[in-house]
Amino acid sequence: MSKISATKGLTAILSIMTLGAALSVGTGAARAGDNNVTEDQIVRALAPAEKKPLTRGLSVGPQTQTDPAVTAAETKFVQTIRGRNTRSLSITEREEIATIVKDKPKIDLEINFDYNSADISAKSLPSVQALGRALTNADLKGSTFVVAGHTDAAGGEAYNQDLSERRADSIKRYLVDKYGINGSDLVTVGYGKSKLKDPSQPMAEVNRRVQVVNMENKATASK
């Protein structure tokens, strides 16, 4: 009788251990993919207001009615920065971009790079690839997008400014080379540590991000 009880006890323990291991693996896999987004999520976030479906769970920029004159001025400004080198943008132009994008469809992507470099890390490639597919989606293709690099507060201002610009350029090169996106449709800008997403935690990973903004719809971009 004691042998049977011991056997049952051992079987129960092994079952619990196996279940625990399975749960551990499952949880780890879910956590590993937390920061990667899908093509569909990006398309929904960047779609113009008239095409944006009513969904929950994804933060997007506010959609407001603007004065036609303001819209025309913004469009004219966007045309002046299309095709420009990232480092050629003045501080005034960078701030003008930051002002305009506040009311545009946008998404923040937590793109990791190799330490102290602009090389996209392997674990973040799925997000960049999803971005490439999204920007060639029929709902978005042909628009002009801002690709803005941001860093955390570690390091000096000049260092972070340069790093954010190089990382934005790295994303642009990947999208142009791998997905055939017109380079003039991607406006790259770096903000260094000047626009932290979470100022209360300046060193937090959430601040190290690439923000993608849809500056104008296809009808406007094609004019």
What residue spans do the PLM features occupy?
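Extracytoplasmic/periplasm-facing segments of secreted or lipoprotein envelope proteins
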Residues: I111-N112, D198
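Periplasmic OmpA-like peptidoglycan-binding domain that tethers envelope proteins to the cell wall
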Residues: H150-K223
